Each structure stands twice: as structure tokens, then as C-alpha cells.
Amino acid sequence: MRAVVLALLTVLLAACTQVPLAEPPPVAPEPTAQPEPSELVVGVEDLGAGFNPHLLAHSSSLTTAVAALVLPSVFRPGPDGVPQLDRTIATSAEVVSTEPFTVSYELNLEASWSTNTPIAAEDFVYLWEQMRADAGVADAAGYRLITDVRSRAGGKAVDVVFDEPYPAWQGLFSDLLPAHLLKDAPGSWIGATTGGLPASGGPFRIATVDAGRGEVVLARNDTYWDTPAVLDTLVLRRLDDAAMATGLAAGDVDVALSEADPAIRTALGGLSPVPRTQLAPLPTVTQLGLRSVDGPLRDARARQGLAALLDREAIRLSVAPEALPADAFGLAPSEPGYAASAPDGAPARPDPIAAEQLLRSAGWARDASGNWTVDGQPVALVIGSAAERPEDGRVARLVAAQLTVAGIDTTAVESPAAELFVQGSAPATEITATTAPATTSSAAPATSSAAPTTAPPPGGGVAVDVIVGPRTVGGAPGTELASDYGCALPTAVVPDPPSTPTGFCFPALQLLLESLAAGSGEDDPARFATAERVLWMQLPALPLFQPVGLVVSSAAADAATGIAPGPLTEGPLAGAARWNEPAR
């Protein structure tokens, strides 16, 4: 009986016990919207031939802009153009000895490449070795005064020793390159930088280079040790004038960097509201390098006579009407202190009578048909331009057309920039289009329907007599004169130095150029005037013009960036690390 009662109680208790309810499934969190990466689009005319700012072959406004954002420099130009120490790279840089002249650099311990390799003494050594011994580089004279680069403190301190005092030393070791990646790279520093830069030491890095689409994407360098860039990406997109205007109107393009010319101004004139435009001179002077080492122009009188046949102003007005006429070998027209040094007449101005006299005094003569000959053979000049520089090609065609009218057989050829500016030679690829130049002077006929000689020279290559190309400006004037027009003299460090592509060397001028390079660049105007006068007599090159760019920006881009032309040697994108994304 007791067992039955216990069994009943157990059943009743079980019936009264509350069965727990199943817990509801967990509520999935609401997805949070990820912000779109911030981006700013810059329209550019061309991507250029490469990204090495030390090579004439890679010289372009885009190369200058990218280098300022990606490559480390010990000194950068301040608002007044005076070099200022970039403490993100070096905490100090000073002259520590005058005998021998020695500069000591203490590098920022945090400064490193995007590969996490420290920015160190080996990068100084690499740039010095390349600049002193390679052809086709810009402003090498200062590096050729260096006798040693010594490393201390595990590579974070550098002592640079010179063979003589060099007051312009602050202009050296800008745009350092990653030695650990380039020193053994195939194609050396030319081939390895043609399609980009392998590492960054600045606030941005090159993320992609798509030559087919015409686009370079800079991304924030997440390994940068200092204040990071505000923007996630900066897109540099190749566009023609019409596409730039359309993109600005639609808001697809925020800033445009174009050549200043009537075509872009016409395209922009149809926009409402009209975007803001600012002129931005480029850090180059377009010139005609005249081959003096051999060939028909080896005599200075022949070079002067050739120049007296050309209408430089007609060429400028036809190719780059807003460019600044360049009438000096040193400072560019946009630089403080510039003064024209060109003589009033030939060879700076067209003068057919003077040209005839100069050419005859150099041994030239006219044949029965009126064409020029030398050494009993018809004069046949090759006018070369870089295939990657279309404006230079237009100059080459105009020069060829003017000389053809004057009775000189000419052939205009294109060459890869690396070949033209290093070797002074070109393959026999004819520029077939011919444009008659505008005429501004009745003294030298400049319009003609005659085309240059169409038959290419025999063989796989040809020495170029007239090289259309850039001369870099913006550095120490004495250094630039010595770099561009000095003799390639052997030293204990560089026993076989490269010459310029034209091979120019005038020993009587060499000591003066060396003294100007070793001076402050501003302390002796009379010596600079003497150098200019001799250069106009010897004429290693004929200056044409300083190209001028146009910085175009929408109101929204202005508010977000405060864009300006920037320092001459860095350009309008110099402050892009601080830019914000424009309001859309």
C-alpha cells in the first residue's frame, strides 16, 4: 500500500513540475554599412615613359607628382622655394667638416620603405653610384663631387665626403630609391622603374599602373610612420581635353592637370559653373640639343647658322602658345632672378643672311639646286624626339619643316626616350605627319607644305643631330649648368664617366662651370653672364620654351584640397597627403 502511495505522489509531482520553454534563437546583429573608400580623381594628359625622377627619359609632370608623394627626400622646397629639412626622413643634416668637406645626416629611426626595410645609408650609396656613372640623368654634377658615402649607426647615420666645398649640398639625395630592390633588378633602375616604383617611402604607394586603361592608382601607404594620408586612393587618369571637361562637369573628375593651350580652355569654357584654372610652370625647358661631337654640326659656326635658320617663336606659338619663351641656358623663365641672355640677332633670332655666312664659314656650300652640302656630300640632318613625348614630336616636325625650306635635307625620327636621352641615337622610324609652323617673322620663311625626307636612314639605328628634349630646372643654377654643358672628365671614383647625348665639351669653359657649381649659385652674376655668353657662342643646345601646365579644379575640389601650382620641383599634388575627398 505504501509503495502505491509513493508511486502516486511521484506522478503528481512530475505533473506539477513546469516544463522549461525552449529559448528563442539569438537575434542576428544588424549589418553595419562599411564606408566607401575615399577617393579623388585627377585627370592627366599622359602617363609618361616611367617613374624615375632622376632620368631625363622619364621626365614628365606625372613623374614629378608621383615622386613627391611616394619617394623620400632629405630636403623639400618650402613655401618660398628654400629647401627645408624633412624630419620624417632625417632628424638632422649639417656640414661637420670643411677639410674634407663633409655633410653628416642623422636619419629618422622610424623611416622605412613599405617593405619594412629601413631607409638607410645604402639608399644614399645607391643613388650616388647611379647618378655619378649613368648617362641620361638630370643634375649629376653635385653627385660627381662626392668621393665617399659612409654608413654609421647601423645605416641610420650617413657621412657624405666631397672633394671640394659644395654649398648646394641640400639639393642632393632627393627622391631616394629603394636600393634593396633596385640594385640587382633586371634592367637596372631604368627598366625596374618603367612600370612603377617597387616600394614607397612616403604617404602614398603606387598600387596599380594600367597603361592600357591609362590609369595610375596611388593608395595610402599603411606602413607610413608619420601622419597618414587622409585619402584612401588618389587616381591619376589619362584623359583628352573633351573627357576632362565632361568629367569635371559630371563630378567624375575632381582635378585636371593639362597643358595650358587654347584647346583645353575652349573645352572648359562650355562648363557652368566654369572651374577654376591656375597656371603651373613645369620644371623643364624644352630645347634642341645639337650634336657637337661629330657630324655636320661639329663646328660651332654650323650650329649657330642652323639656329639662325629657325624661328623659335613660331615653333613655340604653334606647339605651346602659353609656354614661356626661354632665352637663357641657366634659370628658367618662371624662376626668380631669370634674365634673358640671348643676343639680339642670330643665333637667337631668325636671320637668313647671317645663317648663310655662318654656314659657309663652317665649310658648308650650296649645290646647283640650292641645297646645302658639307665635305662634298649633301647635308642630311636627323631630328630626334622621344616617342613617349608627343609635344616634342610636334616640335621635331616643325624644325624639320623649317630646315627643309632653308635647303637642308632633314629626317624626323622617333625613338624610345631611354635610347634617345642616353645614347643620342634613334631607330629609323619616321614621323610621317608634317605640320607647317606659324610664321611670326618675315626674315625666315616658316610655312611650307614640304615634308621632311621620308626615307629612313639605313641600318637599325642612327645618330641624332638635333635632339628635342627637356632640360631640368629648379635646382642650383651652377650645378645645372655644369651638369648640362660640362665635360665628362674622368676621376679616381669614375674613370669612365658618361658624356651628354650630344657629346658637347668646351674645355675653355670647363673651369668656369666647375667654379659655378662649387659656388652658391647667386654670389657672382658676372661669372654667370660670362658662361651664358660663351654658351650662346658655342651653342650646345638651342633653348625654346618652358612648358606651362594648367591646374583645373571644381569648387568642391578647391574646398577639399586647396590645390595650388605648388613648388616648381614638386608640382600641384605636393600637398595631396592632406587632401580630403570632395563633396559629391
Language-model segments: residues:
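Extracytoplasmic/peripheral linker and loop segments enriched in polar/acidic and small residues
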Residues: 33, 316, 411-414, 418-420, ...
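Ligand-site clamp/hinge motif
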Residues: 221-267, 409
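Surface-exposed binding/hinge segments that line
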Residues: 106, 140-186
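Long beta-strand-rich cores associated with HINT superfamily self-processing modules
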Residues: 551-584
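Gly/Pro-rich hinge or "lid" segments in bacterial periplasmic/extracellular proteins
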Residues: 174-229, 233, 352, 357
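N-terminal lobe/hinge region of extracytoplasmic solute-binding protein
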Residues: 43-98, 129, 199
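Append "and occasionally in soluble cytosolic enzymes with long acidic Gly/Pro-rich linkers
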Residues: 298-401, 584
